[in-house]
């Protein structure tokens, strides 16, 4: 699962690139899938799953809105890279969850890049020295509620999860659980505890 995190990081960095290669974009990268003839296993999965189809339509709309406000080669290249990332979910041990998180992540990336989105404060946690700094921003206005974590220079987007107590966020390979001033984290098997104050 760690490769998914690396690909997501690469996607975010490519979106910020000043001059991406001119031939990296696809004219259909932002369009909803054509479910009359899905071309890949992942496209078949999306077309036969109501929730994934809804996410596909939401992403198409969000991407077209982003293009209308700030068309750029970097935005188009990031969307094409995201399409490859989504399609790579066919190799994941849990393709459906991988695809769902890919769509949710891209929706969040586009929303955060929108100047109209309110930017929440950055929270800094006290962690053991060897575990390095951890910061978080919570976008409670998103659906689902989202946290953007930064740990040792890596940014990851996690989504709210059901919790009996405290605040829990996660995605494949990553867990964040805050309870009574203590934050327990698991980043692809690296577990540690930080404090909120």
UniProtKB/Swiss-Prot annotation:
Lipid-attached positions, N-palmitoyl cysteine: 16
Induction cue: Constitutively expressed, increases in stationary phase (at protein level). mRNA levels rise nearly 50-fold during mouse macrophage infection. Part of the glbN-lprI operon.
Effect ascribed to mutating residue 28 to A: Decreased apparent weight in M.smegmatis, a portion of the protein is protected from extracellular trypsin
Phenotype of gene-disrupted mutants: Probably essential, it cannot be deleted.
Keyword annotations of the record: Cell membrane, Cell wall, Glycoprotein, Lipoprotein, Membrane, Palmitate, Secreted, Signal
Bilayer topology term: Lipid-anchor
Modifications the protein undergoes after translation, according to the UniProt entry: Glycosylated; alpha-D-mannosidase treatment decreases its apparent molecular weight. Glycosylation probably helps target protein to the cell surface; mutation of predicted glycosylation sites (Thr-24, Thr-28 and/or Thr-117) makes protein partially inaccesible to externally added trypsin. May also be glycosylated on other residues. Glycosylation is probably not necessary for inhibition of lysozyme.
Domain of life: Bacteria
One GO cellular component term: extracellular region
Leader peptide range in chain numbering: 1-15
Lipid linkage positions (S-diacylglycerol cysteine): 16
InterPro entries per record: LprI-like_N (IPR009739), Lysozyme_Inhibitor_LprI (IPR052755), MliC (IPR018660), MliC_sf (IPR036328)
PROSITE patterns documented for this protein: PROKAR_LIPOPROTEIN (PS51257)
Pfam families noted in UniProt: LprI (PF07007), MliC (PF09864)
Localization, UniProt: Cell membrane; Secreted, Cell wall; Cell surface
Description of how the protein assembles with itself and partners: Homodimer.
Family: In the C-terminal section; belongs to the MliC family.
Task performed by this protein: Strongly binds and inhibits lysozyme, may help bacteria survive in lysozyme-producing host cells. When overexpressed in M.tuberculosis or M.smegmatis increases resistance to hen egg white lysozyme. M.smegmatis overexpressing LprI survive better during intracellular infection of peritoneal and monocyte-derived macrophages, both of which produce lysozyme during infection; M.smegmatis does not encode this protein. Somewhat better survival is seen in human cell lines when M.smegmatis cells express both proteins from this operon, i.e. GlbN (HbN) and LprI.
Protein's recorded name: Lipoprotein LprI
Organism taxonomic ancestry: Bacteria, Bacillati, Actinomycetota, Actinomycetes, Mycobacteriales
Chain's gene name: lprI
């Amino acid at each position: 699962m760690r490769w998914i995190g690396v690909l997501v990081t690469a996607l975010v960095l490519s979106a910020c690139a000043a001059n991406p290669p001119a031939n990296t974009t696809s004219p259909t990268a932002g369009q909803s899938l054509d479910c009359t003839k899905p071309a890949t296993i992942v496209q078949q999965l999306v077309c036969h799953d109501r929730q994934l189809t809804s996410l596909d339509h939401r992403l198409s709309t969000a991407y077209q809105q982003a293009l209308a406000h700030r068309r750029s080669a970097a935005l188009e290249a990031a969307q094409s890279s995201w399409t490859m990332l989504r399609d790579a979910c066919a190799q994941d041990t849990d393709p459906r969850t991988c695809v769902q998180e890919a769509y949710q992540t891209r929706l969040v990336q586009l929303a955060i890049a929108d100047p109209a989105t309110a930017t929440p404060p950055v929270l800094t946690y006290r962690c053991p020295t060897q575990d390095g700094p951890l910061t978080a921003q919570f976008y409670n206005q998103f659906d689902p509620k989202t946290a953007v974590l930064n740990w040792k220079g890596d940014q990851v987007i996690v989504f709210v999860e059901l919790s009996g107590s405290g605040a829990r966020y996660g995605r494949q390979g990553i867990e964040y659980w805050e309870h009574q001033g203590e934050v327990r984290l698991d980043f692809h098997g690296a577990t540690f505890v930080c404090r909120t104050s």
